[in-house]
């Protein structure tokens, strides 16, 4: 199995996936606020991707089936970025963000196995 990266990702090999914890229901606002914060601080080149993984669920209500679009990981946002220590306050100070997921709230990048299981990267066989 081989991971295929886009041109943008190849230019930023040190970019890694991190998970941010957010207030419930603030995931989309956090995404917009992070993009804005990176732009205002002229570091948008360090931000590769922000994702809120969604899934379609079939619900049955009153005998009718309906497809509902739901967050796979409520209260979490996945961010691929080039992380540096000076960004910690920028990210954790973003409205809606409660912190990084990791031991003692320290930014911990996802492992290759976690990235594969979450299907965050394009993979070819």
Model feature map: region roles:
Residues 2-125:
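Acidic-enriched and Gly/Ser
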């Amino acid at each position: 199995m081989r991971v295929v990266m886009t041109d943008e990702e190849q230019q930023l090999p040190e970019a890694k996936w991190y998970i941010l914890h957010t207030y419930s229901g603030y995931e989309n606002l956090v995404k917009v606020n992070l993009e804005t914060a990176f732009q205002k601080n002229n570091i948008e080149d360090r931000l590769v991707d922000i994702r809120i993984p969604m899934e379609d669920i079939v619900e049955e209500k009153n005998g009718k089936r309906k497809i509902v679009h739901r967050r796979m990981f409520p209260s979490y946002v996945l961010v691929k970025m080039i992380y540096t220590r000076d960004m910690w306050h920028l990210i954790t100070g973003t409205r809606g963000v409660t912190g990084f997921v990791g031991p003692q709230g320290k930014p911990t990048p996802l492992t290759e196995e976690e990235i594969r299981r979450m299907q965050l990267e394009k993979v070819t066989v």
